[in-house]
Amino acid sequence: MSEAGERRQGIQSVGIGLRVLEVLASQNGAAALGAIAQASDLSASQAHRYLASLIAAGMARQDAATGRYELGS
């Protein structure tokens, strides 16, 4: 992939991650993976990968009891 292509992909990934964060911020409480995926226009597997990255960065968290996601603290 060319350098320009890599930059475009990186920017797209950041935009998608921000969209997932916006969905989390708009929820009243924790949300299920399917709801986050649908609101973000992603497949469940794509949303799960973005959520895993956001959790690793401390920007989101998953409730161990319910499996639902919300903004990190």
Which role does the model predict for each range below?
Residues 2-73:
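N-terminal helix-turn-helix
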